Amino acid sequence: MKPSGLETPMQQAVAITHTGYYKVGEMTQGLGWESYHYPVSLDKLLAGNSTQMAMEAHEVQWLTPSQPQPESVLINKTGSTGGFGAYVAYVPSKDIGIVILANKNYPNPERIKIAHTILSALAK
């Protein structure tokens, strides 16, 4: 979650993947990773990880220059392959995170809801 303990080349690589290159609504897009100012509501997470967000065109706000992540941020990513689906979310400033691995048929919104519930409890 905090790459400061890694060797310099790895720290730089992680920082580059977390750098924000553009925004769509409340979501900032890095290289694969998507982030939100923390704390973030469940509704904003669901909207940013929705089928509509993934499958439809959206107006983007380019971040020029690209922007490092703010101190309070939730970084997340959904994904699936074969018969498996995953959701990863973490909050570096709180030292909390979760990885959910499930059957691909277990919908993204359900993964996100349970992750948000668990992260909210851990943050207390």
Q: Can you say where each PLM-predicted feature lies in the sequence?
A:
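Catalytic loop of the DD-peptidase/beta-lactamase superfamily, centered on the K-T-G motif
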Residues: 1-124
